[in-house]
Design a protein with these regions (language model features):
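Terminal amphipathic alpha-helical/low-complexity segments used for targeting or macromolecular assembly
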Residues: 1-60, 138, 156, 173, ...
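Left-handed beta-helix
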Residues: 64, 69-70, 75-76, 83-84, ...
Length: 180
């Protein structure tokens, strides 16, 4: 509903449980990824053509001829799919609490943020309200654009620089975490 705001008069963050969010791997694997990411993956000296292989080691499904610049952050590689012939620009952030699926020939430019996570503003506990993101073949997420949870970027779509793209009514309804 356009212009609709959800107002919660009393927030009770102490009751936050994180229900419905599965990191997808045990803590030792998470720790190994964080160490590897911070010590090598994001560094300028780590070759861009090696980054896809390192993501694959940690469970990502990465296609051929993928070019990933330095300072690209990936929360959980095992929740990431990247098709062939994609470019991911410097300082992009793939915040994949839920899966991010990037089709072939996609350009994600410098400083872009793809964030599958959110919170339920109507819930006093502020529980998660996450949903996957899909990016269609040939799309371009321009510099410093933000793509929010539940969005489906159409094939060939351009998300202009500095804009925010959220799920629209035509996008799949994001699933509410922890609801029955």
């Amino acid at each position: 509903m356009k212009g609709h705001r959800t107002v919660v008069t009393e927030r009770a963050l102490r009751t936050f449980s994180g229900r419905g969010y599965d990191k997808g791997r045990p803590k030792p694997v998470q720790a190994a990824w964080f160490a590897t990411s911070n010590l090598a993956f994001v560094k300028w000296w780590f070759p861009p053509r090696w980054r896809p292989g390192l993501l694959r080691v940690f469970g990502a499904d990465v296609g051929e001829r993928v070019f990933i610049r330095h300072r690209v952050r990936v929360l959980w590689p095992w929740k990431l799919t990247i098709g062939d012939d994609c470019w991911i620009g410097e300082d992009a952030w793939l915040l994949d609490l839920e899966p991010i699926a990037i089709d072939h020939d996609v350009c994600i430019s410098q400083g872009a943020l793809l964030c599958t996570g959110s919170h339920d503003a109507a819930d006093p506990a502020f529980e998660y309200d996450n949903a996957p993101i899909t990016v269609g073949a040939g799309a371009w997420i321009a510099a410093r654009a933000t793509v929010l949870r539940g969005a489906r970027i159409a094939p060939g779509e351009v998300v202009p620089a500095g804009t925010v793209r959220r799920a629209s009514r035509s996008d799949a309804t994001p699933r509410r975490q922890g609801s029955s």
